[in-house]
């Protein structure tokens, strides 16, 4: 029974379900047909807000992009028929280029290589009628990518050894085109330029390091350079790496250089520097002066202390040699002597003379004493008549033999216990004696080599009463150190006064 009722119930349910879904589908179709016939129905509030924002964004974007197409149009217009290989005004008039330089840093200045480094911003301005335009833009600022499409002056630096153009993060170049055809081209570069240094007054020297530039291919009748009131901006707030020098100012010069291919206008700017004296003074002058004065200590050392005096003298000479070599270590190989070389050379001479003074003193005292090692001689006691006859014979012998003399070195004992050489005048032999005038002349001939010297100087301590000493300068051998203690410092002082007066006022 149930098997017959269940199929009937299922059929009734299916029929009822189909009747319920039918009106809903029909209502949807009617709604769609009404949209097509009578237009869109009102949208929700969210959709209206989104549409308004989209319209405002499109309006703002259009206003911002409005100048960009205009600038692109101007640039494309002026470059469409532009030939960057030809200069402006070719065949009609020369191109006038106005130059401005801004110095970022100066230095270091290498004395050994005779060059200096400078970091500059180099600006050139000229007029190109082909780049004129009529628009609201007063100027167009372009980066370095457009430089290759424009005519640029072929300026080069004549005394540069190395040139570096900065390219981080982009090439440091800028072009500004004005509506009247004026073009401004700016580039940053670092230049290693040569600087001829005249070191004659070193270390009181001053130098002018040039920076010359001109056109490489355009002569004077095609390109003219000029300064705009010689405008040079120098940023001294930066730490310039001049080290041993002080910056004193700038100057400029314009000249025409004749070459086989034409006359070129050359612009030169000079950077004036002067050397700082403190570094060289402590490195060279002070050690040289101290070493020279140290060599004079030997004058206060006893003559018997030969090793001490010799060591001090040799050490002083070698030290001055080392200082002279060290002063030329970082120095160009010039063929002339500088003021510092002259000072060190004079100090070397003073040290050498101090060593030579001891050698002369030692020679006069010990060598002559050893050569004339003989018993001590004393002045014989004679009566007044015998002394008168001796003096008369001495005068006659002196007149006969052209002021001949007899001087014998003997050893005497001084007041301080030291043995010193002494000179005793001997009675010349009588004409009738075996040792007559011929014998006297033969003895004098042996001393002919020292006659001229002893004619003017007496180098022995006790010669009072000698007839041959009259009219001569007597120098006490044992006082030679005393003389040196005064002569050397005084002479060195006057040399320094004269040296610094000449060097500072030259």
Swiss-Prot record:
It is found in: Cell membrane; Postsynaptic cell membrane. NCBIfam families: LIC. This is Gamma-aminobutyric acid receptor subunit epsilon. Expressed in many tissues. Highest levels of expression in adult heart and placenta. It comes from the Eukaryota. Disulfide bonds join 195-209. Residues 302-307, 365-485 are cytoplasmic. Belongs to the ligand-gated ion channel (TC 1.A.9) family. Gamma-aminobutyric acid receptor (TC 1.A.9.5) subfamily. GABRE sub-subfamily. Keywords: Cell membrane, Chloride, Chloride channel, Disulfide bond, Glycoprotein, Ion channel, Ion transport, Membrane, Postsynaptic cell membrane, Signal, Synapse, Transmembrane, Transmembrane helix, Transport. GABAARs subunits share a common topological structure: a peptide sequence made up of a long extracellular N-terminal, four transmembrane domains, intracellular or cytoplasmic domain located between the third and the fourth transmembrane domains. It catalyses: chloride(in) = chloride(out). One of its GO terms (cellular component) is postsynapse. The keyword Phosphoprotein does not apply. Residues 1-22 form the signal peptide. GO terms for biological process: chloride transmembrane transport; gamma-aminobutyric acid signaling pathway; inhibitory synapse assembly; negative regulation of chloride transport; synaptic transmission, GABAergic. The chain crosses the membrane at residues 281-301, 308-327, 344-364, 486-506. Potentiated by pentobarbital, loreclezole, and lanthanum and inhibited by zinc and furosemide. Introduction of the epsilon subunit to the receptor complex resulted in diminished modulatory effects by etomidate, propofol, pregnanolone and flurazepam. PROSITE patterns: NEUROTR_ION_CHANNEL. SUPFAM superfamilies: Neurotransmitter-gated ion-channel transmembrane pore, Nicotinic receptor ligand binding domain-like. Epsilon subunit of the heteropentameric ligand-gated chloride channel gated by gamma-aminobutyric acid (GABA), a major inhibitory neurotransmitter in the brain. GABA-gated chloride channels, also named GABA(A) receptors (GABAAR), consist of five subunits arranged around a central pore and contain GABA active binding site(s) located at the alpha and beta subunit interfaces. When activated by GABA, GABAARs selectively allow the flow of chloride anions across the cell membrane down their electrochemical gradient. Its main location: membrane. GO terms for molecular function: GABA-A receptor activity; GABA-gated chloride ion channel activity. Residues 23-280, 328-343 are extracellular. Glycans are attached at residues 134, 252. Residues 23-66, 413-438 are annotated as: Disordered. Heteropentamer, formed by a combination of alpha (GABRA1-6), beta (GABRB1-3), gamma (GABRG1-3), delta (GABRD), epsilon (GABRE), rho (GABRR1-3), pi (GABRP) and theta (GABRQ) chains, each subunit exhibiting distinct physiological and pharmacological properties.
């Amino acid at each position: 029974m149930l098997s017959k009722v269940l199929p009937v119930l299922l059929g009734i349910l299916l029929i009822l379900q189909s009747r319920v879904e039918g009106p809903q589908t029909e209502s949807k179709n009617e709604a769609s047909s009404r949209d097509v016939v009578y237009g869109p129905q009102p949208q929700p509030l969210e959709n209206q807000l989104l549409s308004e924002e989209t319209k405002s964004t499109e309006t703002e974007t259009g206003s911002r992009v409005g100048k960009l197409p205009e600038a692109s149009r101007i640039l494309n217009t002026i470059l469409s028929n532009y030939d960057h290989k030809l200069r402006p005004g070719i065949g009609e008039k020369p191109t006038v280029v106005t130059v401005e330089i801004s110095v970022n840093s100066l230095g270091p200045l290498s004395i050994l290589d005779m060059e200096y480094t400078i970091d500059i911003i180099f600006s050139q301005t000229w007029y190109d009628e082909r780049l004129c335009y009529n628009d609201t833009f007063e100027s167009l600022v372009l980066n370095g990518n457009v430089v290759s499409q424009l005519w640029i002056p072929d300026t080069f630096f004549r005394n540069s050894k190395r040139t570096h153009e900065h390219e981080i993060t982009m090439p440091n170049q800028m072009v500004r085109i004005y509506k009247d055809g004026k073009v401004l081209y700016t580039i940053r570069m670092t230049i290693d330029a040569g600087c001829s240094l005249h070191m004659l007054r070193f270390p009181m020297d001053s130098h002018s390091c040039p920076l010359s530039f001109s056109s490489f291919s355009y002569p004077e009748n095609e390109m003219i350079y000029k300064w705009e009131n010689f405008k040079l901006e120098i940023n001294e707030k930066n730490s310039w790496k001049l080290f041993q020098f002080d910056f004193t100012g700038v100057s400029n010069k314009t000249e025409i250089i004749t070459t086989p291919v034409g006359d070129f206008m050359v612009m030169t700017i000079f950077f004036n520097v002067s050397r700082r004296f403190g570094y060289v003074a402590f490195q060279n002058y002070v050690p040289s002066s101290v070493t020279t004065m140290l060599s004079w200590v030997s004058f206060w050392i006893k003559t018997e202390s030969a090793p001490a005096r010799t060591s001090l003298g040799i050490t002083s000479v070698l030290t001055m040699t080392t200082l002279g070599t060290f002063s030329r270590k970082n120095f160009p190989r010039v063929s002339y002597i500088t003021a510092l070389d002259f000072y060190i050379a004079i100090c070397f001479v003073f040290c050498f003379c101090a060593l030579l003074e001891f050698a002369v003193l030692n020679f006069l005292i010990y060598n002559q004493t050893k050569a004339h090692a003989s018993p001590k001689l004393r002045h014989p006691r004679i009566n007044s008549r015998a002394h008168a006859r001796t003096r008369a014979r001495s005068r006659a012998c002196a007149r006969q033999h052209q002021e001949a003399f007899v001087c014998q070195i003997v050893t005497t004992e001084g007041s301080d216990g030291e043995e010193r050489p002494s000179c005793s005048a001997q009675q010349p032999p009588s004409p009738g004696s075996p040792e007559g005038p011929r014998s006297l002349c033969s003895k004098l001939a042996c001393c002919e080599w020292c006659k001229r010297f002893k004619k003017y100087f007496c180098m022995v301590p006790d010669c009072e009463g000698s007839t041959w000493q009259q009219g001569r300068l007597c120098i006490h051998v044992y006082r030679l150190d005393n003389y040196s203690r005064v002569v050397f410092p005084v002479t060195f002082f006057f040399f320094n006064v004269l040296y610094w007066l000449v060097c500072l006022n030259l």
